[in-house]
Design a protein with these regions (language model features):
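Terminal, non-catalytic protein-protein interaction segments that mediate quaternary/complex assembly
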Residues: 2-288
């Protein structure tokens, strides 16, 4: 696989940013940190702290950026897989990342409403305005994609499938729809699909993403999808199983690097993101 990041740098980041969930080795059950793009953790907070530390450690090792349509990418781990053992512990509460719960809950409610209206999510963040193609609707409207976009309610379809066949491998919700390059958009959904697997009385969920920004995406995505997993388990009357989060590209943008992560030449002028960041920077997912 090759070296993703250096163990020494990883451990330094953990201490410098007080990523306390990683102090306890039982919270991170994978293997050696220098090759891992797969991690098993107890909760979402530990998941976020692990990937934040991994990306900063990789940036310290490489000191390179790559261009993208949404800005310079400071570090990237491809095919990053996270297994969360307890999805009911779904809130990022790290010292390095104060998660604005007003926005997180607002985004979840927007999904559950089935709305694709910019004005509805705009109640919680104006950042979505720059992502709308028509100034009225949003493409990354996961709730609308789940309930309305494909002509039937995918949420209810999953319920029906799992009630009819608890061992079904077809309880899948499709989020991203194909779109030709000749039809450009400002807003391409980062989430591809959600698959619910009911095994041994426990409902497991696997989310597959094409792209995920560790700063503005991961905290809110995991919060929303773990919440949906718990809701589905309650509806079916079963226990909550594990949550698996797969990202083709997991990354952090240069603009979101903490101030102390400047490159040796001093060319990196990014500022440390505000920990109490409010909603303006919160969750614009389309080009992550």
């Amino acid at each position: 696989m090759g070296l993703l990041f250096n163990v020494e740098d990883f451990n330094k980041v953990v201490k410098e940013y007080k990523l306390t969930s990683l102090y306890n080795k039982s919270d991170r059950l994978c293997g050696d940190a220098d090759i891992d793009n797969y991690v098993v953790v107890n909760d979402v907070n530990c998941a976020w702290e692990y990937w934040f530390a991994a990306l900063l450690a990789q940036h310290r090792m490489n000191r390179k950026t790559a261009s993208s349509r949404d800005g310079a990418v400071a570090a990237e781990i491809i095919n990053a897989i996270t297994v969360v053992k307890d999805p009911t512990r779904m809130i990022v509460k790290s010292e390095a990342r104060k998660m604005p719960m007003r926005y997180a809950v607002g985004e979840l409610l927007w999904y559950l409403s089935g709305s694709n209206k910019l004005k509805d999510i705009g109640l919680f963040s104006s950042a979505w305005e720059r992502m709308s193609d028509d100034g009225e609707t949003v493409n990354s409207c996961y709730g609308h994609k789940i309930q309305h976009f494909y002509g039937f309610d995918q949420w209810q379809d999953v319920i029906d499938r799992l009630k009819a066949d608890p061992n079904s491998r077809q309880a899948v919700i499709q989020i991203k729809n194909p779109r030709p390059m000749s039809e450009p958009t400002k807003d391409t959904p980062c989430t591809l699909s959600l698959q619910f697997l009911l095994r041994n009385g426990h409902l497991n969920l696997t989310t597959t993403m094409r792209s995920n920004d560790v700063w503005t995406g991961v905290p809110y995505d995991m919060f929303s999808f773990c919440s949906m997993q718990v809701m589905m388990a309650m509806t079916l009357g079963v226990d909550v199983g594990t949550y698996t989060h797969q990202a083709g590209s997991l990354h952090i943008y240069e603009r979101n690097l903490p101030a102390g992560e400047k490159d040796p030449e001093g060319n990196n002028e990014t500022q440390k993101p505000k920990l109490e960041s409010g909603v303006q920077e919160s969750s614009v997912k389309s080009n992550k």
